[in-house]
Amino acid sequence: MDNITHSIKEGCGNPMCNNAYCKSNPEHSSISENEMGDFVVLTAINEYKECCKFITPKQIYSMTPNDVFQLPIEAYLNDNSLKASFRDFPDNCSSRPKGFEYINHQSIFLFMNFLFNVSNPETIKKVFNSISLVQPEQRVLFLCVPYQTKYHNYYGALFKLITENPINKEVIHQFLCQMSPEHLRQVHFLVHSFLDEMFKQGSVQRSNKYPFMIYALRLFKILYEMNIANEFIDYKSFYVYSINIKREWSDDFDLFFKNKEGLLSYSFIIELYTRVLVVHEENRCEQQLTLSGAIQNNFFELFSPYLELRIDRDNLLLSSLNSLVNKRPIDLKKELKIKFIGEVGVDQGGVSKEWFSLIVKELFKVDFGMFTYNNKTRQFWFCSFADDLQDFKLIGIVLGLAIYNNIILDISFPSILYKKLLDIPLTFDDYNILDPEVYNSLMQLKEMSKVDDVSSLQLTFEAVQNYFDENRSYELIPGGRDIIVTNQNLQLYLDRYADFYCTSSVQKQFDAFKQGFRQVVSSPLLLSMRPEELELVICGTKEYDFDALERNAKYKDYTPNSPQIKYFWEIAKSLTLEQKKKLLIFVTSNDRVPVGGLGNLIFFIDRYGDPEKFPTASTCFNALHLPPYENKEIMKEKLLFAIENAVGFGLA
C-alpha cells in the first residue's frame, strides 16, 4: 500500500509510465486527498499493478558488476521498462519523450557490458530470448551488447530481429545517429566480429546461416553509409578479410554472381585487391557467354578472345582513337594486344605496357593543351579551352582498358575526378583539393565576413581564366558582372565559384572523358567503389614495401637461399626511394605499385647472363635476368648502372 500511495503522490519518476494513476504519467488521473484512502485500499484488494521497473543512467554509473548480477534481469527486459531506462530525464519533464530523446548511450553500453561479463550463459540466453517480446523500435538498444565468441550463434538472431522489419531501418539510423564516434565503433566491432567469425567457419552461401549473414550485412551497410557521411572509422575497417571469395564463388557460382542480395551487393566488405579479382572473374564469365553465343550462331571464326589494335607509332593518337571509339563495350574488356605497324614482335604484355605509357605521356603533355598542370599540387585538370572532345573520350577509354589489363597508370588527377566519375556530388570544400591556394583565399573572405562587410572589396559574381595571356571573365550567375558580393550572398558566390572551376567550365571535356570511361567500365563492383579505391585501382599505391616484394618473388635457377639472391635483396632494400622506383621501371616498365601492394606484383629473377655484363630485364614478364655475380659489391655496381640507364638499355 505504501508503494501505491507513493506512486499516486510522488510518481515513479518515469515520464513514460502508463499507470493511469501514477503522478509521473503525463496523462495521469488526479485523486484528491479525501479519495486517497479508499482508492489505495480498493486498489490493493484488486491486485494493483506496480509501475514498470527502469534503470536510470545515474543508477548505472553507481553500480558495480555485483549489483548487476543481483538484479532481477527479467523485470527490466519488458517493453515498458526498456522505453524508460537509460534516459536522462530533465527534472521538469512533463511530456512523454519521443523516439530516443534523452537517451544516454554510454549507460546502455556500460550496463550491457556489466551484464555480459557477470552473468551466466543461461541468463544471457534469457536476454536474447526476450528481445523478440520487445517492440521493434526498442530492439535497437541491444546493438550495445558486446561481442563474445561463445554467444556467436545468438547474434545472428539478434540482427534478424532488429532489421527484418523494413520500417526499422529509419529507427536504426535514428538511434545510431545520436551515438558518439566511439560508440559507433563499438557497434561496428560487434557486427564486424560476427561476420568475420561466420566466414572463418567456411562457405556460408548454401548453409542455414546465410539469412543471418544478410541481416548482419544490412546493418553493416547502414553503418557504412553513415561513415561516408561522417567518418567515424577508416573505411578499410569494413573489409572482412576472412572472406574466401574463390571458395564462395566455387561453392555456388550463380548464387555468388547473380543473387540480388548476395555478397556482391555488399562489396564494401571485400578488400580492394580481392574485389578487383572478382571484377576480372566477372569479365571472364561475360566473355565466355559471348563466345558461347558466337559458337551457337556459327560466328566462331569471327570471334577473337583479344582486343587487337594496329597502331601507327608516328600517328599514335589518331590511330589509337580510330581503333577504339567504335568498339563494343564487351570487346573493350578483352585482353589487349598491340601491334605497332611495320614492327616485328608479338605482344606478350610488354608492347601493351609501352602503348599505355606512350599514349598517357602524349595526352598529358601540357603543350598538347588537353590538361593544365598545377605545380603546387602536382596534379592535372581539364583545360576548359580544349575543344577536341574525342581526345578526352580516348583518355577515358584508356583508363578503363588499364583496369581490365592490370596496368597501373602514371597519372595524377585530384581526387574530385574520381568522385565525379562515380556521380558523387561535390561540395565547396572539394575545391580545396583542386586548388588549395585559391580555396584558402576564398576562406579568408568567409572569415572576413564575420567581422567586416566583404562588399567593400567590390567583388562581383565573375570568374577569370587566362587563355594565352588573355584574361577572360565569365559570369557565375546571370548578370553576375553587375552583382556585388556581400555578406548576405557570399556563400552563393563561394559555391558558384567552386562549381565553375570544378564542374561547369570543364563540363564538355569531363563528359567526353566520362563517356569513354563508362564505355569500358560498367561493373557495379567498380562503380560502387569509394573514390579513394577507384584511384588506387587506376594509379596504384605509394607504399614501396620491398619485404612484401621479396616474399612474393619467384626464381629460376636460383633459390631464396642462393648467395646472389641474398645480395640482391640486401641491395634492393638499401636503395633510396627514387632508386627503388627506377628498379621497378627497369623490371616492370612502371614504378607504380598495384592494388594490394608489392606483394601482389609478379616479380621473377632468373640466373642468366655473363657475370662480366650488366643485368637485363624482360618487362613483358616482369623478369630480372641476374648474372651470378661473385660478390655484393660487384652486383650493386652493375645493378645501379643498369637501372640508372634503363631507357633503351638491355630491355627485352
Feature map (PLM): residue ranges:
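Long, Ser/Thr/Pro/Gly-rich and/or acidic low-complexity regions in intracellular
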Residues: 1-132, 147-150, 156, 160, ...
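Intrinsically disordered, low-complexity, charge-biased terminal/linker regions in eukaryotic proteins
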Residues: 137-140, 154-157
